[in-house]
Design a protein with these regions (language model features):
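N-terminal mitochondrial targeting presequence
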Residues: 1-17
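C-terminal helical "tail/cap" subdomain of flavin- and related membrane-associated enzymes
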Residues: 13, 21, 319, 377-489
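Conserved N-terminal helical subregion
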Residues: 23-27, 76-222, 294
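Glycine-rich FAD pyrophosphate-binding loop
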Residues: 30, 43-68
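Conserved Rossmann-like nucleotide-cofactor binding loop
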Residues: 37, 41, 61, 190
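Conserved FAD-binding catalytic core of PHBH/FMO-like flavoproteins
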Residues: 170-326
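FAD/FMN-dependent oxidoreductases across multiple families
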Residues: 270, 284-374, 379-380
């Protein structure tokens, strides 16, 4: 998509002069942002023959441990299509934990004790998926990108972007400006690259289209705990030692829906030396968010989690939790334009810059890696911008809608709605199984497709899954109307 001409417009020379900058570094490609999508894009650009590839990131290092961002990724079949293509899967497996045989151990505060359960979304298609901490994945991708010759610049902030006089794009970073004919915006939901493109096209094509979701707006913080620790089995008073490689959920003493009930979630981590965090995800009015000091956090934990000795959470961790700013899940969202041409420069958006959503289906990193794989596949195409737009804009829209419906009540925000959703999920599974026995595969998929969450986790095409869901919804609605009409008659 070529951008329309804009007159008058300041030249890059005017822009640089205004900033007092004079050093211009000409490169073949610039990636803005060194999260998973950006580092993967740097690897892909080098793989596709680009010589001078620069990736810019404001953080000081790729693998900094940040408690507020100490979540884990599940790199599934979709994400592994890219890691397989570049030979990075084994390195990621070496730093992660396989999802094969995944189970979740529940550690209750009462006589229910401790026992393993099978998660609802533990799919056979995700058996080879890999759990890996964010810092570990970033380190693996950064090492690969640097090994391949990408120039990773950490501790560098982007001050602005503008069209250069020669048709390229200038990216101002302090005293240096990178001039490039190819830009990849991997800089998140508040993308500077996307904002730059919005100045050149009608802004509406780059404005996120937000969808309502029961999990949107939920507030979260991370509570640091040791990689392994002892808890009390309230059934018999015995000690139980957790392992870093296993997953746990720790329900609170309060069980009725109220502003004290919550659960701690711990996902598996391979490295026993890496700090571990427990996820706390609750609505904004929950009492835990009112704990303003470490002492108040400690009092809350003692009251609600008698199965956890004080030693599990240090005083420092309690204080850090109290003063940390909470995060909030975004609404599922997407943008309609994911690539454009500025002058002679090609600009592409990947990852959260084109689609963002709550982590309900674990698709953030996988959708981003699929973006990067598609980008690499079309780069040699003379019409790469149009080809990428045609492939990823529909995918971004589809995954946003799928997350909206996939598994939004898993955070215990409404007991009765969660149960109602689970009944519907079981019903869709049963209908799909029955249709598969009675009808040819293609017809069965049209009439009663498997739940959207299952198809997404199994690695099926986002757009195809969304089409099946919409078609089945229309068929179900038509059937319900027909039955109602017949009953009235």
């Amino acid at each position: 998509m070529r951008l329309r001409a804009r007159l008058p417009r300041a030249t890059s020379g005017d822009y640089l002069a205004g900033l007092g900058q004079s050093t211009v570094e000409e490169v073949d490609a610039v990636v803005v942002g060194c999260g998973p999508a950006g580092l993967a894009a740097a690897v892909e650009l080098k793989r596709r023959g680009f010589d001078r590839v620069v990736a810019l990131e404001r953080r000081e290092a790729p693998d900094e441990f940040e408690v507020a961002k100490a979540y884990l990724y599940l790199v599934d079949r979709r994400g592994q299509r890219w890691t397989d293509a570049v030979g990075a899967t084994d390195g990621i497996r070496a730093r992660g934990v396989s999802n094969e045989g995944f189970s979740l151990t529940r550690i209750y505060p009462d006589e229910k004790g401790i026992f393993p359960t099978k998660p609802v979304l533990a799919r056979p298609g995700a058996a080879q998926a890999v759990w890996i901490p964010r810092a570990s994945l970033l380190a693996a991708l950064a090492e690969r990108a640097a090994h391949d010759g990408a120039d990773l610049r950490f501790g560098v902030s982007v001050d602005g972007l503008c069209a250069a006089d020669d048709g390229a794009v200038d990216i101002a970073c302090g005293a240096t400006t990178r001039r490039t004919p190819l830009v990849v915006g991997a800089d998140g939901a508040r993308s500077r690259v996307r904002d730059f493109l919005a100045k050149e096209l009608p802004a509406s094509s780059f404005e996120p289209r937000e969808l309502a979701s029961p999990s949107a707006g939920l507030t979260y913080k991370m509570l640091q705990v040791p990689p392994s620790f002892d808890v009390t089995n309230k059934t018999d008073g015995s000690r139980f030692t957790t392992r870093s490689r296993d997953a746990y959920t720790v329900p609170s003493r309060s069980t009725k829906p109220n502003t004290r009930r919550l659960r701690l979630g711990l996902l598996p981590s391979r490295d026993p030396e890496l700090p571990r965090t427990a996820n706390i995800i609750r609505p904004a009015n929950h009492e835990i968010w009112g704990c303003a000091t470490g002492a108040e956090v400690r009092e809350f934990l003692r009251s609600e989690f008698p199965q956890l000795p004080d030693a599990v959470v240090s005083d420092e961790a309690c204080e850090a939790f109290a003063i940390a700013e909470p995060g909030a899940f975004p609404s599922p969202q997407y943008v309609e334009t994911v690539a454009a041409t500025v002058g002679a420069a090609r600009c592409f958006l990947v990852g959260d810059a084109i689609h963002a959503f709550p982590p309900d289906l674990g698709q953030g990193v996988n959708a981003a890696l699929e973006d990067v794989k598609t980008l690499g596949d079309v780069l040699d195409d003379q019409n790469a911008v149009a080809a990428y737009q045609a492939a990823r804009a529909p995918a971004a829209k589809a995954i946003a809608h799928l997350v909206q419906r996939g598994f939004p009540y898993q955070y215990d925000q409404s007991v009765w709605r969660q149960r109602l959703f689970t009944v519907g999920l079981v019903g869709r599974v049963a209908a799909n199984a029955l249709a598969a026995k009675l009808l040819p595969e293609k017809i069965a998929t049209r009439v009663a497709p498997p739940p959207a969450a299952f198809s997404v986790i199994d690695g099926e095409d986002y757009v195809g899954v969304w089409k099946h869901i919409k078609r089945a919804t229309r068929a179900t609605t038509a059937l319900a109307v027909a039955v109602l009409a017949r009953a009235v008659i």
